[in-house]
UniProtKB/Swiss-Prot annotation:
Record carries keyword Amino-acid biosynthesis: yes
Gene3D superfamilies: Enolpyruvate transferase domain
Encoding gene per record: aroA
GO cellular component: cytoplasm
Role description: Catalyzes the transfer of the enolpyruvyl moiety of phosphoenolpyruvate (PEP) to the 5-hydroxyl of shikimate-3-phosphate (S3P) to produce enolpyruvyl shikimate-3-phosphate and inorganic phosphate.
Record's catalysed reaction(s): 3-phosphoshikimate + phosphoenolpyruvate = 5-O-(1-carboxyvinyl)-3-phosphoshikimate + phosphate
Residues that coordinate or bind 3-phosphoshikimate: K28, S29, R33, S179, Q181, D332, K359
Keywords: Amino-acid biosynthesis, Aromatic amino acid biosynthesis, Cytoplasm, Transferase
Main localization (coarse): cytoplasm
Binding site for phosphoenolpyruvate: K28, G105, R133, Q181, R363, R406
Lineage, opening ranks: Bacteria, Pseudomonadati, Pseudomonadota, Alphaproteobacteria, Hyphomicrobiales
Organism: Nitrobacter winogradskyi (strain ATCC 25391 / DSM 10237 / CIP 104748 / NCIMB 11846 / Nb-255)
A GO molecular function held by the record: 3-phosphoshikimate 1-carboxyvinyltransferase activity
Protein name listed in UniProt: 3-phosphoshikimate 1-carboxyvinyltransferase
Amino acid sequence: MTLSGQTMPLEARKCQSLTGRVRVPGDKSISHRALILGALAVGETRISGLLEGEDVLNTAKAMQALGAKVERRTDDNGGIAWSVRGVGTGGFATPEAPLDFGNSGTGCRLVMGAVAGCPIRAAFDGDGSLRSRPMRRILDPLELMGARVISQSDGGRLPLTLEGARDPLPIVYRTPVASAQIKSAVLLAGLSAPGVTTVIEREASRDHTELMLKHFGADIVSVAEGAHGRKISLTGQPELHGAGVTVPADPSSAAFPIVAALITEGSDIVLDDVMTNPLRTGLFVTLREMGASIEESETRLDAGEPMAQLRVKASRLRGIEVPAERAPSMIDEYLVLAVAAAFAEGTTVMRGLRELRVKESDRLEAAAAMLRAGGVAVEIAGDDLIVEGRGRVPGGGLVTTHMDHRIAMSALVMGCASDAPVKVDDIAFIATSFPDFVPMMQRLGANFA
């Protein structure tokens, strides 16, 4: 739905093949963190490849409201870079108005952590979707560190007002679920605390915050904890220094053209500079297990993050079982994986998807509804999603997006190879993470109308 209140429907029709070379937008997780740490650093941070979607732009506005200077610059060759002049650790100022994060749970929760370590008061708000999402798991550890929730909606939901700690306490905190957002909020609050703040995870979540904190000069150590977990220790009150950041292409965004190419006969595409951090590439591992042709080349590192060029060719996929412990490394990709499973031969079982129920929508139910709209046999058993692949998808249905960008893009990918067109009721929210999705897919050969 647009700002004027009008919906933006779109139909995807079967296309001949997808071919070409593109770079999907910059990684959303890295973009948020680069802006926030740049704002907490001393000096200038220059960011190239920043995702200029609504979610990230709302974080940039929040950093300005908290006292940092944020500018978008264009060089003589037309290249775009963002400049952030920070206020130093603990230096945020009280904002004059509520911080509005729109649809972005990541931006909102990370900034809550940063504010919790500063002696200020800030109000947090968002759109209807974000207001429905739980914040209590973020607020609980922040209150242990000395922050106070002054006002909140039912169950710790937005809108709420948070008062940061004047003297933040370092804590040892065991996350109740594998969540990079909980971990990151605690670490960002811990920047202002004397001593060592420690986060212990039973299942390792994405480690972008740890890598970027180190890039900005923080003293942070991460070691294995148990079979699959991590123990992260941050020494507080560092002086972070502005740094250069090149944002790699977002693997969660790359997932859509990748799956579209795999299921569309004759396709052969190349994606440049895609992040290949092993804590984010569960989808690539899973698709390869299903028989996908995904080749990596030109690998390199920037700010501790690995990236590579990916070549993807149409492939015959087969159904597999996806273990629950893989969920943290691909939590945002299950919707489009469900599309791949629908085009595979055989049954695909995706285990342990409870966290999908508290995303922008109940993505577990939404995934099943999307596939049923396309004529696919699908079942939810507890927290598991079971897809009966037949090698083809009839299509012909209407998919309701529930204001969720990933439902919209996944449904359009399904329509690229289904027998009959697939219609999406509203694509407006795609702009939160992948503003150029439709024209980029059309350049590759997608048939959207």
